[in-house]
Amino acid sequence: MKEESAAQLGCCHRPMALGGTGGSLSPSLDFQLFRGDQVFSACRPLPDMVDAHGPSCASWLCPLPLAPGRSALLACLQDLDLNLCTPQPAPLGTDLQGLQEDALSMKHEPPGLQASSTDDKKFTVKYPQNKDKLGKQPERAGEGAPCPAFSSHNSSSPPPLQNRKSPSPLAFCPCPPVNSISKELPFLLHAFYPGYPLLLPPPHLFTYGALPSDQCPHLLMLPQDPSYPTMAMPSLLMMVNELGHPSARWETLLPYPGAFQASGQALPSQARNPGAGAAPTDSPGLERGGMASPAKRVPLSSQTGTAALPYPLKKKNGKILYECNICGKSFGQLSNLKVHLRVHSGERPFQCALCQKSFTQLAHLQKHHLVHTGERPHKCSIPWVPGRNHWKSFQAWREREVCHKRFSSSSNLKTHLRLHSGARPFQCSVCRSRFTQHIHLKLHHRLHAPQPCGLVHTQLPLASLACLAQWHQGALDLMAVASEKHMGYDIDEVKVSSTSQGKARAVSLSSAGTPLVMGQDQNN
């Protein structure tokens, strides 16, 4: 970049120290010069005292892309110290050569943060200590980097932009010492501001013992000003999880409050300090990024084992009895008991995505999927055997045909194989009838133990005719009145006698004036 390009700078920005005034830069500061939507960064080390606005700097300033908005702070690394500067706009038409002369006039001033006249608005950043003193000191592994201590009135209510011609003075405070310097950090550092690489401290400042949020609580927290656009998304949050230390905490470095206001989310201060009756909530960025907060993680002991049961289990002879507290049914293992408890609670956690049908077990859902896919992996390859009253099987046996039926589950194939072998393993204990499936035996048991009849009969077997006549006495009286008028006789008694098969043998009508008696002979 040639010298005439420096003269065409429409609006230059001078670095302004946070705590002092002056017009020169220290040689170790990485300086950035702004023009419009570009930033000029030094490509080579600076001399002892030089002004980057001078025309002599135009030959080694290289343009870099700049973010849409400018930040209020610039972090400059000086050895192991981190100094924060703010860009100060220079008025249009300022002589760059005059600025260089002002910088050279401050060259021989004593080190430290020195302030000159506030009218000319010249600022400088000096070495906090000389190089010879730095070489005599031992290794600075136990020392912390200085950080800016923002005053209370500046952090709570910043002045408006039109009144902030010069930044408020800020003091540099030493940070608490750290234990050790880690070369490999256990966390991923995301840049909040891609256009400002200097806004993030160097990696050696982040150690296991102290986090940036502990050392410098206001680091990376810009003032709450709506004029600064949102430069970082809340999902790009940094998190540190220290597994090696028992007192490890989860700390997050959040962008300035304007980022949360622009996205319509709550401020970090509101999430950290909720009301007295409200529970603390986690950062929304962590949930959106796919990282769950430790506060929401339930211990594994409450999810597995006997702790998941709503009641304690009993022990007998040193062994745990997996017994249901509702129906008293016992099981051999805990998983079967948990599945059984879903029958009483009505819980069906496994749902089909196609037909929305729910199941109590995952195996049932997997078997149900075969209904939608039409897959029948289980095939019968046994020749037909003549069965009892099974004409089709007899014809197939004569022709020596092989059954090629297919089934979606192995249980259905097992039941089908009983048809070929003629096995009937389920036998009734009352009438000695045998069945191929257990469900057929359960339906057969209802014939031997009929349920008590109610007022409403949905199914009316022959054995419940006597019960029907007993409960509907009023209907029989109405029938008697109608018969007397039209047929000339009354229905005084209905005699119903049934056999064990439930068939009615005799129903007698008499004209005697005796009351209706069920289940008794006419002589009685």
Curated annotation (Swiss-Prot):
Gene Ontology MF: a single term:
promoter-specific chromatin binding
- Got a GO cellular component term for this one? nucleus
Superkingdom of the organism of origin: Eukaryota
GO biological-process terms attached to the record: adaptive immune response; cellular response to ionomycin; innate immune response; negative regulation of transcription by RNA polymerase II; negative regulation of type II interferon production; positive regulation of gene expression; regulation of extrathymic T cell differentiation; regulation of gene expression
Chain positions of all zinc fingers (C2H2-type): 322-344, 350-372, 398-420, 426-448
Arranged from A to Z, the UniProt key words for this protein are: Adaptive immunity, DNA-binding, Host-virus interaction, Immunity, Innate immunity, Metal-binding, Nucleus, Repeat, Transcription, Transcription regulation, Zinc, Zinc-finger
Compartments annotated for it: namely:
Nucleus
Q: In which tissues is it expressed?
A: Expressed in terminally differentiated effector CD8(+) T-cells, but not in naive and central memory cells. Expressed in terminally differentiated natural killer (NK) cells and natural killer (NKT) T-cells (at protein level). Expressed strongly in effector-type CD8(+) T-cells and weakly in naive and memory CD8(+) T-cells. Expressed in terminally differentiated natural killer (NK) cells. Isoform 2 is strongly expressed in effector CD8(+) T and natural killer (NK) cells. Isoform 1 is expressed in effector CD8(+) T and natural killer (NK) cells. (Microbial infection) Expressed in cytomegalovirus (CMV)-infected effector CD8(+) T-cells (at protein level).
Q: Which family, according to UniProt?
A: Belongs to the krueppel C2H2-type zinc-finger protein family.
Quote the record's domain comment. Answer: The C2H2-type zinc finger are necessary for DNA-binding.
Q: What does this protein do?
A: Transcription factor that mediates a transcriptional program in various innate and adaptive immune tissue-resident lymphocyte T-cell types such as tissue-resident memory T (Trm), natural killer (trNK) and natural killer T (NKT) cells and negatively regulates gene expression of proteins that promote the egress of tissue-resident T-cell populations from non-lymphoid organs.
Q: What is this protein called?
A: Tissue-resident T-cell transcription regulator protein ZNF683
Gene that this sequence comes from: ZNF683
